[in-house]
Structures are given as C-alpha cells and as structure tokens.
Amino acid sequence: MRKIAIYGKGGIGKSTTTQNTVAGLAEMGKKVMVVGCDPKADSTRLLLGGLTQKTVLDTLREEGEDVELEDIIKEGYGASRCTESGGPEPGVGCAGRGIITSVNMLEQLGAYDDEWGLDYVFYDVLGDVVCGGFAMPIRDGKAEEIYIVVSGEMMAMYAANNICKGILKYADAGGVRLGGLICNSRKVDNEMEMIQELARQLGTQMIHFVPRDNMVQRAEINRKTVIDFDPAHQQADEYRALAKKIDDNEMFVIPKPLEIEELEKLLIDFGIAN
C-alpha cells in the first residue's frame, strides 16, 4: 500500500487535483482510500457526488467512543473509500490536533487493514504546513510520498519551498520522500518552464502539468470529477496521465529547499517580475 500526502498553498486546487487523480487510479482498477485532512471537509465531495460527509470529529463529538468504521467511511466513485477528519468548532481548539485524533481513530478501527486490499491511501492536507498537526502525515510516517500542487504564482512557489523544508526536517525520522511537483496551471507566463526549473533546483521532477480548463469547474458544479462527468474530455485524459505517472513513479527524493533569494531570482529569470 502506497501512502501519499498532497500538500500545497491554500486555494491552489489540492482537493480537486487529488479527487480527479483518485478517479483516474480507480478507473485503472486501483483500490484507493482518501483521507481529507482539512476542516473544510471538501476533500471527498466530488468522489461522493456532492454528498456532504459527516466528519470523524463530528461523529466522535456526537457518538462518543462508540464509533464503527462504516459511520466514518463512505464508498465513492470507482469503489474509492472516503473519509473526512473534519476540525474543531471555529475559534476553539486546534485543527492539526484533530487530524491526529482522526487518523489514530481510523487505525484503531482497522481502516488500513489488509482485508480492504488498498493500493493507495491519499491524505489531502490543508495549506502550507506551518503547524505541527498538519505536518503529522509527514512527521509520523503516515505518508511516505509527498506531491506538492503548485503554480507559477509567487506565493504558490513560496509555499512549495516551505513544504520542502518540512519534508527535509522529517525525512530521516519518518522516511518520507518528495515524489514531485504537480503544476496546476494558472496560465502564468512561462509557467511550465519555471516549475520545471523550480523542480530541478529542489532536486525533484515536475511530474505533470495540468492545463487550466473550465471543464474542471463545470464538473465541480455538477459535483463530480472530470473523469466521472465527461470521461471523453481532454481534461479527463490529463488526470488519467497524472494518475498513471504517480502509479509508475520511482523518483523519490529528499528535497533541497531554496533560499528566498534563489526563489526570487527564479521568478525574475522567467520574466514574472517584469
């Protein structure tokens, strides 16, 4: 079973990219579980056809310790298994702590057991890993491969670099490695070349360039992944290609984070600062 965490700047399209990629893997016959690690609890919506799922923390709050696995895991597109850790009430408690509670709960209830025949577990993780709780999949060896969703925008690249610092910090203890950057295009000038160069300097690869297409939004409005909504569309093939590249990937590295000056030089070299 491969354990993968998807990180990236808030709003970059992690949940969308994760769910569309999972749909691609499911179509290939892979058995996948998705663990949403975001208080917004939107990491599985498209796989479940828009069904709002009761989160692990909500279930715990309402039912106490008496929780069954089927209370917190729902079956989604292509027999994917979907669960959301959820978060504390706004303004109370720590969302990162909630993720730790949820993942421990899933382990205790046997969500990762061999009987499910899982090929993949995906953790879709909030934001920029500035807080220890959100770093938990990296820190405690829950995830072994990290993919960072990035674009050619300054803050997305800055966040990706920060995440690499987190991976570097825990690489020895948790055995976690960076599998590559996924460029979720924002149609920035020279975007593909810039992210390829960023990947090179970090010592990794740009595993796939996902072009910007309104079909993604159209599918989302219909509460589906692109592969589910319009399987013949070119954008569906992009996600299939990404799924295949992740399935075939053998490049796992400890990244070499850039200094802020190097990052700014990269932006200037590719003309974004002009």
Curated annotation (Swiss-Prot):
Function: The key enzymatic reactions in nitrogen fixation are catalyzed by the nitrogenase complex, which has 2 components: the iron protein and the molybdenum-iron protein.
Protein family membership: Belongs to the NifH/BchL/ChlL family.
Catalytic activity: N2 + 8 reduced [2Fe-2S]-[ferredoxin] + 16 ATP + 16 H2O = H2 + 8 oxidized [2Fe-2S]-[ferredoxin] + 2 NH4(+) + 16 ADP + 16 phosphate + 6 H(+)
Family annotation (Pfam families): Fer4_NifH
Keyword annotations from UniProtKB, A to Z: 4Fe-4S, ADP-ribosylation, ATP-binding, Iron, Iron-sulfur, Metal-binding, Nitrogen fixation, Nucleotide-binding, Oxidoreductase
Species of provenance: Chlorobium phaeobacteroides (strain BS1)
EC number of this enzyme: 1.18.6.1
Complexes and interactors: Homodimer.
HAMAP family linked: NifH (MF_00533)
Residues that hold ATP according to the record: G8, K9, G10, G11, I12, G13, K14, S15
Modified residues (ADP-ribosylarginine): R97
GO biological process entries: nitrogen fixation
InterPro entries: NifH/chlL_CS, NifH/frxC, Nitrogenase_Fe_NifH, P-loop_NTPase
SUPFAM superfamilies cross-referenced by the UniProt entry: P-loop containing nucleoside triphosphate hydrolases
Binding-site residues, [4Fe-4S] cluster: C94, C131
Posttranslational modification: The reversible ADP-ribosylation of Arg-97 inactivates the nitrogenase reductase and regulates nitrogenase activity.
Family annotation (NCBIfam families): nifH (TIGR01287)
Cofactor: [4Fe-4S] cluster
Gene Ontology molecular function, alphabetical: 4 iron, 4 sulfur cluster binding; ATP binding; metal ion binding; nitrogenase activity
The name this protein goes by in its record: Nitrogenase iron protein
Entry note: cofactor: Binds 1 [4Fe-4S] cluster per dimer.
